[in-house]
Amino acid sequence: MFVDRSSPMVASAISTSKLPRIALLALLVGFICPGILSRDFWGSSELSAFSTILSMVNGTGIDWALPNDLGVNEYADTPLMLWCGAAFVKLFGWLLGTEVAARLAILFFYTFTTGFIWYGTWYFARRDEAQPVALAFGKSASPRAYGRVVGDNALLLFIGTLGLFIPLRELDSEIALICVTAAYTFGLGWALWHPKWGSLATGAAIGAAILASDLWLGLILLVAAIYIHCRAHAFIPQPLMPRLVCLILAASTVFFVWPIAGVAFTIELVDAWWLGWWQHQIALIDLPSSKDITWMLKNGFWFVWPVGPFMLGCLYAFRKQIGRTHIKLPLMVLGALAVWALFVRNPNEGILMAFIPPATILAGFGMMAARRSWSSLLDWFSSSVFSLIILALWLYYIAWHIGMPPKMYHSVYKLAPMLTPTFHGFWVGVCFATTLAWIAVMMWRLNHAKSIAWRGPWLAAAGVSAIAIIAVGLFGNLIDANRSMKPVADRILADFKANQGTAQCINADELDNAQIIYLRHWGLPLEKAQCEFKLVQTARVEQGSEVIGYYNRPRDRHGFILLKK
């Protein structure tokens, strides 16, 4: 039946039918917008990053070049994401508000990440050695259509990755890190077609890796890129030195903008700051431990679902052609990231996020090579599990408002006991329309031909996006009350004003600088000076002080105490 069996993939013209671009764009927007434009900050890492962004916005060039919180140097929050957040606050803070403007950095990195993943996959899939077998009967997919559908699959699987559901919406350095690894993989794919431009893009990603993560990731990616350019057979016919010069020049230029800016703004402080930065980099690395490896293996499986299984399926399908460029290069990127992850002290979700872009490229090919039973498994999982989750969200929302059934009501009530359920007609309408759209997708799934290659990833991405919209739309204020510090700050401010008298400030000696900055932003007059009132974060109450109130989020074991001397 086939003319050639040199590839494990088969793709007909019908199976590579074009996914409507409007539908894809709507899905990308629908996935990321919930939790970006209408929420408070949910985690301590977001609050820490936001406090540093506020220091930049309200400070001078020194605060931009050498990130700090009230003069205390900040090394954990990497500058790339902070610069973008502060820049958006400067540009749009007057229009959107400081919090929303800062979160535009998430939208910025998300846009580039999705673009890098799609175009990186496109460049790998367009190569002759990546093409599927030619059909003896029937029309085979054209290289352009095949590259497009593999790119769509990779991008849809990225959107449908369960582990990215929350981290991809948080104002944290990991959102810049995942963009950098996507750009790095894209640069390698682009270099196959445009050697100099691709090498420049790869080098820029290496320099940005230091700004988005740490020095060691940048060095490992640099060594990996040099090795790939020297040894990968696809690059051998091309002149080596121009590519290496472009690679190293771009990496050096992007990184050294930072220290040069530090010297330009404050040569007096730069030595001490960079010494602290270097000590922080040394503290980041450690020898691999069985505990860390076990943690990554245990959490990695669910974090990368459904990308992981299809990536492994791709490697199995190409086990006899593992040296092909479209498989070998993303796999080598994963290997470089694995070396970095092994030596990082206390790995976390951010480490796992870095693996997603090259893994999605392999998973995109894996979808094309998968048997129909495996593709149907993704269909079944998306259709059944996501439909049940959407149904459960509506049932819990109704129970929260009517108080029945009692068990469901109390499950929601205990998340924010002080919050009174309110009905927001606009958001309920949006969620209802989203539910109808999901039902329409399910009907399309039941009635549509099974031969379209992007059907399974489309269902996964659409299901995750629908859940995001419905969860935030129905329970946005509940999530804010449970996870945000703003309601806590509002209660402290209300009690302070009720008991203020002639007092003008609240002593904050026992709070860290990040807490002081974001609580000040929400109106609390915190000072590190003698004040009649004092805000502490401890279970011990000072003698001779009157307790005005206790304040904490429902999820916190310990909160704040406002004292009056």
Q: At which residue positions do the language-model features occur?
A:
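Transmembrane-helix motifs of polytopic, lipid-linked glycan transferases
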Residues: L104-P143, G160, A183
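Short periplasmic/luminal acceptor-recognition loop of GT-C membrane glycosyltransferases, typified by
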Residues: L70, G429-L446, S451-K564
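Membrane-interface transmembrane helices that cradle and orient dolichyl/undecaprenyl
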Residues: A145, V149, Y184-A201, I206-A209, ...
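Transmembrane-lumen/periplasm boundary regions of multi-pass, lipid-linked membrane glycan transferases
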Residues: S48-G59, A204-L329, V333-E349, I361, ...
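Extracytosolic helix-loop segments that constitute the early lumenal/periplasmic catalytic or substrate-binding loops
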Residues: A49-N73, L80, A87-K90
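Short acidic/glycine- and proline-prone juxtamembrane loop motifs at membrane-interface regions
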Residues: G163-L177, L217
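Loop-to-helix entry region of an early transmembrane alpha helix in multi-pass inner-membrane enzymes
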Residues: P79, W83, F92-G120, G147-R148, ...
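Start-transfer (signal-anchor) and selected internal transmembrane alpha helices
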Residues: M1-C33, P242-A251
